[in-house]
């Protein structure tokens, strides 16, 4: 999470002055939240990654929009994951591509059957009328959606995430949709804690503590880079010697020839044996994972069957008492 906020740009004080004039028109005052929200770090990482990728592709900060999915039990909402949404601008108003949303929802339902659509997210400063316009479109898909906004340009050390719900207030005799801010808590699972800890260690300056895997990959990258530069230098010398640009140095050419013959030959029987052994090990691990998943599914099926059988057996015995 800290890395998601650290990957931001800079923000000026003039933007804060403009936002301060906009916020009162879309924020409801004196309204308490009606639901309790638990937010998973994976959602924040997804939004931050979405924003950074769009900024890299476009060369400038871009507003991104996506969907929030999770679980809801009564007044308790748990936001567990998210996915991106397509949108386009018509007359300076953002229009969500609903067909794309329904396609993505169907795909997520195949993998995460227990998760449901909870709301949407975007990036930027405090809520403004354009967010109200998008929120009304989301209300056509789901009733009372959540609205999450992440500010990637803030310099504050606090988590730059705010969660809102919509309320209807009477302003000048007209029903007007406003946002009411909700309090939220962070809920993490073991896999998320490991991932967030790894991201937090990998700072943008590279001065932070790196994981063992990262250090190993960095060392390999440096070695391969040095090897590539040396081989390129030898190749350029051989080409220059053939072209007559530099005089032949038989000692250097003999060393290059010997180096080429020292390289391992990948067509040996030992290499083939080790290669096939490794392929078999990888295939076996994948096969064991599939078997484990199948056994778990069968176990759940047997448990449900036993519960149903016991209920039917009790029903038969109860009916037998009256005959």
From Swiss-Prot:
Superkingdom in the source lineage: Eukaryota
Major localization listed first in the record, in broad terms: cytoplasm
Pfam families: JAB, MitMem_reg
Keywords: Cytoplasm, Nucleus, Signalosome
Domain MPN, chain residue ranges per copy: 37-170
InterPro entries reported in the protein's UniProt record: EIF3F/CSN6-like_C, JAMM/MPN+_dom, MPN, MPN_CSN6
Subcellular location: Cytoplasm; Nucleus
One BP term from GO: protein deneddylation
Gene Ontology CC, one term: cytoplasm
Keyword Nucleus: yes
Transmembrane segments: none
Family (UniProt): Belongs to the peptidase M67A family. CSN6 subfamily.
Reported function: Component of the COP9 signalosome complex (CSN), a complex involved in various cellular and developmental processes. The CSN complex is an essential regulator of the ubiquitin (Ubl) conjugation pathway by mediating the deneddylation of the cullin subunits of SCF-type E3 ligase complexes, leading to decrease the Ubl ligase activity of SCF-type complexes such as SCF, CSA or DDB2. The complex is also involved in phosphorylation of p53/TP53, c-jun/JUN, IkappaBalpha/NFKBIA, ITPK1 and IRF8, possibly via its association with CK2 and PKD kinases.
Quaternary structure annotation from Swiss-Prot or TrEMBL: Component of the CSN complex, composed of COPS1/GPS1, COPS2, COPS3, COPS4, COPS5, COPS6, COPS7 (COPS7A or COPS7B), COPS8 and COPS9. In the complex, it probably interacts directly with COPS2, COPS4, COPS5, COPS7 (COPS7A or COPS7B) and COPS9. Interacts with the translation initiation factor EIF3S6. Interacts weakly with RBX1. Directly interacts with COP1 and 14-3-3 protein sigma/SFN. Interacts with ERCC6.
Protein's name in the database: COP9 signalosome complex subunit 6
Organism: Sus scrofa
Gene expressing this chain: COPS6
């Amino acid at each position: 999470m800290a890395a998601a906020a650290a990957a931001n740009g800079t923000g000026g004080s003039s933007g804060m002055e403009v936002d301060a004039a906009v916020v009162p028109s879309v924020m409801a005052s004196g309204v308490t939240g009606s639901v309790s929200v638990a937010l998973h770090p994976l959602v924040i990482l997804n939004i931050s990654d979405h924003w950074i990728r769009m900024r890299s592709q476009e060369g400038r900060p871009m507003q991104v929009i996506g969907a929030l999915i999770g679980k809801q039990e009564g007044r308790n909402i748990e936001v567990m994951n998210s996915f991106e949404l397509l949108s386009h601008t018509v007359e300076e108003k953002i229009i969500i591509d609903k067909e794309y949303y329904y396609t993505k929802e169907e795909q997520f339902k195949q993998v995460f059957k227990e998760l449901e659509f909870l709301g949407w997210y975007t990036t930027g400063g405090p809520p403004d009328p354009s967010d109200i316009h998008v929120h009304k479109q989301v209300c056509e898909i789901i009733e009372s959606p959540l609205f999450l906004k992440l500010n990637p340009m803030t310099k504050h050390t606090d988590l730059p995430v705010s969660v809102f719900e919509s309320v209807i207030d009477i302003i000048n005799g007209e029903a007007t949709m406003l946002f009411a801010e909700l309090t939220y808590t962070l809920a993490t699972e073991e896999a998320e804690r490991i991932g967030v800890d790894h991201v937090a260690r990998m700072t943008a300056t590279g001065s932070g503590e790196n994981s063992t895997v990262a250090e190993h990959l960095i060392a390999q990258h440096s070695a391969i880079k040095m090897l590539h530069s040396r081989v390129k230098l030898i190749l350029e010398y051989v080409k220059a010697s053939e072209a007559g640009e530099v005089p032949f140095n038989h000692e250097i050419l003999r060393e290059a020839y010997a180096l080429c013959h020292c390289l391992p030959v990948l067509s040996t029987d030992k290499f083939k044996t080790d290669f096939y052994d490794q392929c078999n090990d990888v295939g076996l691990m994948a096969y064991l994972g599939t078997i484990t998943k199948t056994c778990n599914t069968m176990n759940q099926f047997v448990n449900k069957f036993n519960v149903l059988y016991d209920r039917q057996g009790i029903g038969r015995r109860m009916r037998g008492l009256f005959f």
